[in-house]
Amino acid sequence: MVANVSGIGSVLQQMQAMAAQANGGVASPAAALAGSGAATAGTFASAMKASLDKISGDQQHALGEARAFEVGAANVSLNDVMVDMQKANIGFQFGLQVRNKLVSAYNEVMQMSV
C-alpha cells in the first residue's frame, strides 16, 4: 500500500510539472521533462525516445497486471489494475497529443514560403 501512495505521489508531481509548464511556470519543456525523469539526455530525439519507452513500459506493465488479476494472482488487487490502466491511458493520450502537435507544427513549417 505504501508503494501505491508513493506511485500516486510521483504521478501527481509529474502532472503538477506539466500544469506549471502549460501555465508558463516552467522556463523550458526540458526542465519539466528533467523534473519528471522522462529525459535522460539533452537532445529532442532522446527525450522523445525515453518518453515513448516509458509509455510503452507503462502499457506493458498495466497489461501484465490485468492478466495477473484475471488468473487470480493473490498479490494483485483490482485497484492496482485500474490505477495502472489509467496511468497507461493518460500516458498514451499525452503522447498522442504531442504527436498531433508535432505534425501540426511540421505542416505549418512546410506551408511557409521561403
Curated annotation (Swiss-Prot):
It is found in: Bacterial flagellum basal body. The lineage of its organism: Bacteria, Pseudomonadati, Pseudomonadota, Betaproteobacteria, Burkholderiales. This is Flagellar hook-basal body complex protein FliE. Belongs to the FliE family. InterPro entries: FliE. GO terms for biological process: bacterial-type flagellum-dependent cell motility. It comes from Burkholderia vietnamiensis (strain G4 / LMG 22486). Keywords: Bacterial flagellum. GO terms for molecular function: cytoskeletal motor activity; structural molecule activity. Disulfide bonds: none annotated. Pfam families: FliE. One of its GO terms (cellular component) is bacterial-type flagellum basal body.
